[in-house]
Regions:
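Active-site and donor-binding regions of nucleotide-sugar-utilizing enzymes
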Residues: 6-30, 35-131
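Residues that mark the start of a beta-strand
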Residues: 1-5
Length: 171
């Protein structure tokens, strides 16, 4: 039975080429599907003639945009995917929260990240946890980091005043 594999085009084409090579080596004639912005569709059609493409509006991937576009969301979820890949043009997956939110709503068996060096990591995506961490915890983490930075600066200024102004006058 042929595997249904979905790739979200979140990386440059050199990484996508690496990923496609990996998929073709490890799977026998897979059904490959892409989610791509409108601007990348022609390049995907040129490179991968067999791929089915879900066209996402131009701009960055955003959960709210997909959620509003019911036709696109429904057409993506008609199939249960055996594997979903989230490629990155970088080693780390910083700022991929929106993409993870999108992937967590798609019917799938397994989800993998694929970085620019070809390292594959299986992901466990739970929509509720991702949404809570991204939408609610991020502001608290941001405020906490600002608070800690402010305290460190304040302590450094107090230390400087005591060491170089108060103690210097006593000697």
């Amino acid at each position: 039975m042929r595997k249904n594999i979905l790739i979200i085009r979140s990386a440059n084409f050199s990484v996508i080429d690496l990923l496609i090579d990996y998929i073709l080596k490890n799977n026998e004639r897979p059904n490959i599907f892409f989610i791509s912005q409108e601007a990348g569709v022609s390049s995907i059609k040129e490179r991968f003639l067999d791929g089915n493409i879900y066209i996402y509006p131009n701009g960055s991937f955003n959960y709210k945009t997909l959620n509003k576009n019911k036709h696109l969301a429904d057409s993506i979820n008609k199939i249960i995917y055996d594997e979903i890949y989230m490629p990155s043009s970088y080693e780390n997956f910083d700022d991929f929260q929106e993409i993870k939110l999108i992937l967590s709503t798609i019917k799938r068996e397994k989800t993998f990240s694929f970085n620019c060096y070809g390292k594959i990591t299986e992901l466990s995506l739970d929509f509720k946890v991702l949404y809570f961490n991204y939408k609610f915890m991020f502001p608290f983490k941001f405020i906490f980091s600002l608070l800690v930075t402010g305290i460190v600066c304040f302590i450094s200024i107090i230390y400087h005043i005591i060491k170089y102004h108060v103690l210097k006058n006593e000697v």
